[in-house]
Design a protein with these regions (language model features):
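Short, low-complexity disordered leader/linker segments with a strong preference
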Residues: 1-38, 60, 414-421
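Extracytoplasmic "Venus flytrap"/periplasmic binding protein-like
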Residues: 57-125, 160-162, 257, 261-265
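A structural signal for short loop-to-beta-strand junctions that line the ligand-binding cleft
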Residues: 91-92, 121-157, 187-188, 299-302, ...
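Hinge/lid segment of periplasmic solute-binding proteins
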Residues: 98-148, 175, 202, 288-290, ...
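Short, solvent-exposed loop/beta-turn-alpha elements that line the ligand-binding surface or hinge
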Residues: 114-125, 167, 189, 208-229, ...
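Extracytoplasmic/periplasmic solute-binding protein
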Residues: 140-144, 149, 173-220, 226, ...
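Glycine-centered hinge/linker elements that transmit conformational signals in sensory
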Residues: 178-179, 217-247
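C-terminal lobe and pocket-closing loops
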Residues: 270-284, 295-391, 419-421
Length: 421
């Protein structure tokens, strides 16, 4: 995914901004010397330009702290972080996927940051980042940035059909408009049968969940009335196009399908629009974005919030410097800059206006205010590895009895989530 880079700002101005919002003395210096805070950030989470600007500004504002950032690859990062937390040479700050925090916290390898929430404006954090950053009642992950799915649509096809996306305030209005678009060789929507993150949003809209916990034991919840209603809506929407019922958005890549020119809309992160244009330059300027509509007017659809949290290993050599680093990077000034630079959703709802001029990011921000995460337990990783949710969706879309298939999938989820208990 390609992102727009942040325009350069002088180090002097940056340092002044940092000084104005800095956390003050952190006690991290080593006997009057300079402390080096070791940081692991993930590939492409920030641009090289942003990383340089932040590092220079931070070090100018905090002359007793040097920043050493190591870029990590997503492939295999779970095992690498687990190994680092178990050793004696862990970095001071680690960027972790928001849904990964629970498994690292369960191991006892993370520092409990609960007493720093107020200092870090925790009351305003996006729920989809803050909730998975907590485990067993304690806050381990500090929300860093978010991204979620929106509707990417063809402006010209919507206009030709007389559909105004601004008027699609409910799911039923969305269905009616998509039905109108689904004619004359145009797919109203390309929705593959196994886009389970989208299904999760519809389930949450109905008041349901993928799984629930009681007395320390997790239970699959796809067979509840609420979850079944979410699946029923997914089936209605999926039928208004030619998306395959037995695969997800990667097989075939849905951006490439949309680039062929016969698809009116897809559910994707805004970055998917860049891939569409790369595959068909004639569509440049013809793509727009709107939040996934909700069940009722005035409330956008629930979405799965992807993104990252920042954590501090329990074995970190410089925890005070680590917290100073985190406070700056997750504070107002740098969150606004990061959001503009990378088309992200900032970590707090009050900062959403920072991306008002970015159509894709602003559509994400509307949805992110109603964001959720997958069940906050290490056991969910086993569910995703098998992914009975995908099999359930295909079974229903190909004629299976929804209640029976949901019961089977829920049993599989229950088994997977409790396998290690």
């Amino acid at each position: 995914m390609k992102y727009r880079l942040l325009a350069g700002v002088s180090a002097l101005v940056t340092a002044a901004a940092l000084s104005a919002c800095s956390s003050g003395g952190d006690g991290a210096g080593e006997a009057g010397g300079v402390t080096t805070v070791d940081v692991w950030l993930m590939r492409d989470s920030v641009s090289a330009a942003f990383q340089k600007e932040f590092t220079e500004g931070f070090e100018a504002a905090h002359p007793d702290i040097d920043v050493k950032i190591q870029i990590q690859e997503w492939d295999g990062i779970g095992q690498k972080i687990t190994a680092a937390l178990a050793g004696n040479d862990a970095p001071d700050v680690i960027e972790a996927g928001n849904t990964q925090v629970a498994q690292f916290a369960e191991s006892g390898g993370l520092l409990d940051l609960s007493d720093r929430k107020d200092e870090l404006d925790g009351g305003d954090w996006l729920k989809g980042l803050a909730e998975p950053g907590a485990y067993d009642g304690k806050q381990y992950g500090i929300p860093y940035y978010a991204a979620n799915r929106v509707v990417v649509y063809r402006k010209d096809l919507f206009e030709k059909a007389g559909v105004d996306p601004a008027e699609l305030t409910t799911r039923e209005e969305w269905i009616a408009a998509t039905t109108k678009l689904n004619r004359g060789g145009t797919q109203g929507i390309y929705l593959p049968g196994q886009l389970w993150y989208a299904l999760a949003g519809f389930v949450w809209d109905e008041g349901g969940d993928l799984a629930t916990e009681s007395g320390g034991r997790w239970k699959g919840a796809l067979d509840t009335p609420e979850a079944l209603r979410g699946m029923a809506f997914y089936a209605r929407l999926q039928a208004l196009g030619k998306g395959p019922r037995d695969s997800d958005e990667d097989d075939p890549p849905q951006a490439e399908v949309m680039a062929q020119g016969q698809v009116a809309q897809v559910i994707s992160t805004p970055g998917g629009a860049n891939v569409v244009v790369e595959n068909n330059p004639e569509l440049k300027g013809k793509l727009g974005f709107f939040p996934i509509p909700g069940k009722t007017a005035g409330t956008p659809g629930a979405v799965f919030t992807g993104g990252s949290d920042l954590v501090v290993p329990a074995a970190a050599g410089h925890p005070d410097a680590a917290l100073t680093f985190i406070k700056e990077l997750t504070g107002d000034a740098w969150q606004k800059k990061l959001a503009v630079a990378m088309s992200y959703v900032p970590n707090r709802t009050s900062l959403a206006p920072a991306v008002a001029e970015d159509p894709g990011a602003s559509a994400m921000a509307v949805g992110a205010a109603h964001g959720h995460a997958t069940p906050n337990t290490p056991g969910w990783a086993a569910v995703e590895a098998e992914n009975p949710v995908k099999d359930y969706m295909t079974a229903v879309l190909t004629g299976g009895d929804a209640e029976q298939e949901a019961a089977k999938a829920s049993a599989d989820i229950t088994r997977a989530m409790n396998a290690g208990s």
